[in-house]
Amino acid sequence: MHWGFVLLFVYGLLKQIDSLNQLEDSSLLKFEVVFASVFLFLLLIRFIYMKTTQQSSLPESTPKPQIMAAKITHNGMYICLALIPLTGLLIGLLFWLGLKEGLLTNLVVGAHELSVSIIYWLIGLHILAAVYHRLKNDGVWSSMVPFWKEK
């Protein structure tokens, strides 16, 4: 499930639009709405699944600040992963309503861009933490990555 989301997110990045004017193509606008809606639905399912069935793989000896950093990073990733399609849907709605420019559109576009920027940093931090745990050989890596398992 984790790696499926990685692929879905990367696809979303690769197919992103370069300009709001591209949304004048109604088939592209519809595709963006469907993609964002499906992404949000799958994100919600994943969030519920993870919160109800999974426990942290951090060892009990993990320092409290590190546990807090992991929680902040994970929750921040979920928030950004939700905000990106939500703000994208709002951009599409505003565009569809004819509000292609103006303060409201600029605010929503700014929130969208900020969410994307923050998720890049959080993903980087997530990867650094995974590598740290791989080097530490404490079992966390093996719970995150399907290859190069710890012994």
Walk through the language-model features, giving the residues of each:
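Membrane-embedded alpha-helical bundles that constitute the cytochrome b-like, heme-associated redox core
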Residues: 1-151
